[in-house]
């Protein structure tokens, strides 16, 4: 099986001044994940590395760069899933952690549970020796400004939630195993303790070697209502291609609950899709040593991986 990785940097509205950074960020993440696959590494390792790369990138609403809750604090959710045995690990409402996706994987591999939240997740992180990151180090000036603006009496909640950020990755490795990973800071100015779709298995992501893997982004409550990631895999199990399955599921979410979002998908044959019903979604994929990436509907730039690696080392 030829390895494939697909990543997304969140569906919604990407402001012009952030386009270049967002595009470069998903390309970097895809190249890092593909590097692991190319060396014979697992899909699980590849998606974790890709998502970790975006958590460390302030252009995205995950890890450093996460939006703030109503109290001006960062609370993050993440999930990772192994399609080989349906094992999954997730964390929700976690604070002071630089890479929630790493903690989610530890939940999967070091506990009998699938989801830890808030204080319990914090205690587990301490037990696992994960260093605590001061909350201020996860807050960017952009996130702080958005939080302040959204507190204004005349602010429009629907307007500021158009900038829906989440990061994710799906992959298939040489052994034919699939995996997914998703991480987010959630909704801006959300209630303390709010948990969205990302940490919920079947909503923020799902992976099963029998069909494929999906990672979602968009309005979390809508995604949870239709269990979007699992719905996409169901459509593929009925014979749909990744692209058709993604489009069908997104259309259902839009017509049934009025929700917009985006998805990345890979099936167990290595076919992939990156689809969205929002205005934009940054995405990138590598297959057959070819990098493809874009932000707008219909946009698809392509370059050889070797050339992309040189460009990335020179600052894209």
Q: Where are the regions a protein language model picked out?
A:
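Alpha/propeptide regions of enzymes that mature by internal proteolysis
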Residues: 1-316
